[in-house]
Amino acid sequence: IALLGPSGCGKTTTLQMIAGFVDPTAGAIRLEGRNLLAIKPAKRGLGIVFQSYALFPHMTVAENVAFGLEMQGVAAVERAKRVAETLELVGLGAFAARFPRQMSGGQQQRVALARALVIRPNILLLDEPLSNLDAKLREEMQIELRQIQRTVGTTTILVTHDQAEAMALSDRIVVMNQGRAEQIGPPHEAYERPATPFVANFLGKTNLVNGATVRPEKISFGASGLTGKVRTRIFQGNHWLYQVDTDSGLVTVIRQNTGETMPAEGALVHLVWDMAP
């Protein structure tokens, strides 16, 4: 599950309330019938990966991962076994003796993930865990993180402001606005059938054409349709981003880069789209 929304919407506060770092002013937080508000944070059985990873710099990778097990009083033999298994799971089996300073950002992120998973938590909480990585590494880690989550099967709550990340990693998203959930559901459902104007405008780009909302990637250039003049076109690698002046206002168009010749700035074009859901 991904908690998604703009800065200040309450997603991180919600995660902190689940973790026990912030007390809600009213209500309850229930896990398997238990009210977590009556349980101390350390006893809630939650694994947490912080945005900064929060690794201990004076400990090796193995010692960092073992820390939670030590706090639980797990015997040394069992502790070593579970640490080794978890490091293999995240692809760091050969890095147990290294220190965090000797690891890349992506490797440190996996150490933090291993430390959270090794205690076998009821719920895994991820607080923008990929935000410190560069764009390419972030995409790679999204794939790895999803595979690991599928392998262990632990219920996971992810906080992110990155829409692509939320859609790539989650089975359900909670779109939040000013402390409220505007929509809860599968990512594709929230994107294709937004429940509120806020969700429609927040998830991706949206055009309002003749009273209807149309996603930019649903619009193509045709022989007839809504006539307009290309104001700007921007090449963004795998796609072209267009802004077209029409009688209905400025319309944004996104077309995949297929290698075909695309309209130039100043060209007259006709915009067409399918209104079917």
Predicted features by range, described:
Residues L4-P6:
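The feature captures the beta-strand-to-loop junction immediately N-terminal to the Walker
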Residues V22-R30:
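Conserved post-Walker A/P-loop segment of ABC ATPase nucleotide-binding domains
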Residues A28, R34, R180:
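ATP-binding/catalytic-site motifs of ATP-hydrolyzing domains
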Residues E32-G33, Q72:
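ABC transporter nucleotide-binding domain catalytic core, centered on the Walker B motif
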Residues T206, T213-P277:
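Non-catalytic connector elements of ABC transporters
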